[in-house]
Amino acid sequence: MKQVQLKSRAKINLSLDVLGRRSDGYHEVEMIMQQIDLYDLITLEERKDSEIRISTQCEFIPTNEDNIAYRAAEIIRENSGINRGVNIYIDKRIPVAAGLAGGSSNAAAVLEGLNHMWRLRLTPKQLMDLGVKLGADVPFCILGGAAIARGIGEILTPIEGLKNVWMVIAKPAISVSTAEVYRQLDLSKLDSRPNTDEVIQAVKEGDLYTLAGKMHNVLESVTQRNHPIIREMKRKMLEYNAIGAMMSGSGPTVFGIYKNYGRAKSAYENLSILYKQTHLVQSYSRRKWDE
């Protein structure tokens, strides 16, 4: 029986700006996305019937069509005109609903894995075109590495990402609705916005100190107001020697960037006492088809 196993990597945002609201209700964004080496393990196994079955050790994610990985299997079947079944096992390690694109990354892995397992020969561009129908972050998760994302997040320009930079990420025990964060965002009241070009230059040069001073997420203004723990977590990251700290996506996960492994590990040991879902990670900057 055919089987494929893939790593489904998380992402963080090194900057996130919202440019305005579109006529279709979505928001126009400009952000820098960076993969990290925290990943879920996705195992795909061909079935003899035509059913799609999802299983996981994580009680917080659905195992039916409400799971974006299920819908990814459906959409690639429909696109290819085939009716094969598949078992999808998700070994969930990325925190759920955390602003880390865990679900989108799972969907990307299913698209890539079934493309390989069923020998569909779809190009990365074709996979990304399918992915955007599932969610704005899915195309980036197919691309991998680091990129500038524009539009609703689906217009991607690859960039040189951070190379093996040590980070600590921590998710507090709260949930955040992305739709509600965007609804509450008042662009006219923003105190500051990121300079994307300056962030890109700092990333390209590997200048972590300049990056720390330039990276900015406009959605923090909403999530921090609703959940003061975000501000406290950033303060704790800096207290434990982070060069810079920021919220990823709409939250609630906060990440800190560290000068070296020793400082990151020390921070991880301290922060994991305070926050259960804390991870010691590195940036990951290889695009999928470079591997």
Swiss-Prot record:
SUPFAM superfamilies: GHMP Kinase, C-terminal domain, Ribosomal protein S5 domain 2-like. It catalyses: 4-CDP-2-C-methyl-D-erythritol + ATP = 4-CDP-2-C-methyl-D-erythritol 2-phosphate + ADP + H(+). One of its GO terms (molecular function) is 4-(cytidine 5'-diphospho)-2-C-methyl-D-erythritol kinase activity. It is an enzyme of class 2 (transferase). GO terms for biological process: isopentenyl diphosphate biosynthetic process, methylerythritol 4-phosphate pathway; terpenoid biosynthetic process. Coiled coil: none annotated. Its EC number is 2.7.1.148. The keyword Nucleotide-binding applies. ATP binds at P95, V96, A97, A98, G99, L100, A101, G102, G103, S104, S105. The keyword Nucleus does not apply. InterPro entries: GHMP_kinase_C_dom, GHMP_kinase_C_sf, GHMP_kinase_N_dom, IspE, Ribosomal_Su5_D2-typ_SF, Ribsml_uS5_D2-typ_fold_subgr. The active site is at K11, D137. Pathway: Isoprenoid biosynthesis; isopentenyl diphosphate biosynthesis via DXP pathway; isopentenyl diphosphate from 1-deoxy-D-xylulose 5-phosphate: step 3/6. Pfam families: GHMP_kinases_C, GHMP_kinases_N. Catalyzes the phosphorylation of the position 2 hydroxy group of 4-diphosphocytidyl-2C-methyl-D-erythritol. Belongs to the GHMP kinase family. IspE subfamily. This is 4-diphosphocytidyl-2-C-methyl-D-erythritol kinase. It comes from Alkaliphilus metalliredigens (strain QYMF). The gene is ispE.
